[in-house]
Amino acid sequence: MIAGLVHVRRHPALRTLTLTGAVASFLAFPLLTYLPVIAGQVLRTGASGYSLLLTSFGIGAIVGALATARRGHVPGRERAMLLYLVLFGGATVAAMASGRQWPAMGFLLVSGWSIVSAFSILNSLVQENALDALRGRVVSIYSLAFRGGMPLGSLTAGFLVRSFGAPRVIGGYCLVLVLLAASLHLLGPRAGFALTPDESRT
């Protein structure tokens, strides 16, 4: 495990991808935690409306996973991943701003599709940029960072929701996620995304 940590720390691409996974999961997944609150307080549809919202998100997630798997290895996936993060943030805010059930379902379908697509690409990039001998340990480190971001994001959101309400907190999280993706896009090579798998293994 120590060798994996050293490998991640020394390679800009792996370091950036791991941190991106942790921060993105921190910011994105509180949406699912507070979706019942959004259904009840924003859309005023109650339990039945929440079920439809969650179903829409799930359908989008399935479509995103299948589409990403079918597309396979294509150039420019790093940029596509960042675009998906921006799309998730925009669609989620639009779902809350719509104020109506059916438009919100459509936007959440896009949210599910885009966030799963982003994380699918992110996971494949981590594996491709890791040394063969250390791939298992590198993926374990990434998985720890990714999965650790989920509960921490929801925990932090819980404290903020008490003061600002769920819509503002989720909207703020989405804004930060969009800014993160935009920053990584502008940084380009300095963020480590210019490294190809072959270059990162040297």
Model regions and ranges:
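C-terminal transmembrane bundle of multi-pass solute transporters/carriers
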Residues: 2, 9, 35-202
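Short helix-kink/termination motifs in transmembrane helices of multi-pass secondary transporters
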Residues: 18, 26-38, 121
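Pair of pore-lining "gating" transmembrane helices in MFS-fold secondary transporters
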Residues: 7-29, 109-113
